[in-house]
Amino acid sequence: MSDMHQMSADEVIAHLDLELLEGEGCWYRLLWNNGSGNAIYGMVTPREFSALHVLAEDELWVHVAGDPVDLLILHPDGSHQQVRLGKGAGQTPSVLVPAGSWQGASVATGWGLFVCALAPAFTGFALATPEHDFTAWAQVSGRIKELIRG
C-alpha cells in the first residue's frame, strides 16, 4: 500500500517498525537523538493510548497521519488544555507541551500517528497512578481517569 491513510493500525505499525512503549502504552520508534534533542514517531489506537505522564523536557507534538489525537495537558499552575491534534477543521496540527506538565493522549477510533520532538533530549518520565493527587484539575477528572493505567 502506498497511501498510509488507507492502512490499518497493524499495517502502520509494521510499515514504520513501531514498538509498544511499556508503561506509557503508545507505539513508538526513535527517529533521531543527538544528545541535545530527540524525536520519535508515536501512534495511539483506542487500546494503546498514551497514559498520563510528565517529562522534564519541552515536547512538541506534530500530527502526521490518521485520525485526530485528543491530547490532555495539565499545567503546573492548575490550568489545562484539551487539544485535538489533527489536520481537520477545529483541529491543530501541532502543540507544545511545556516541561513539567502532565500529558496523555488517545484516539476515539482508528489510529493517530504523530512525531514528538524534545529539547533537551529525553531523560525519562514519571507515569501517573490512580494514587496521584490531581485535585487541582477537578474539572477534567473524568478525562484524567481515562488516561491512567491500572
Task: Enumerate the language-model features and the residues they cover.
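Non-catalytic, conserved peripheral segments adjacent to functional cores
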Residues: 2-96, 104, 111-112, 120-124, ...
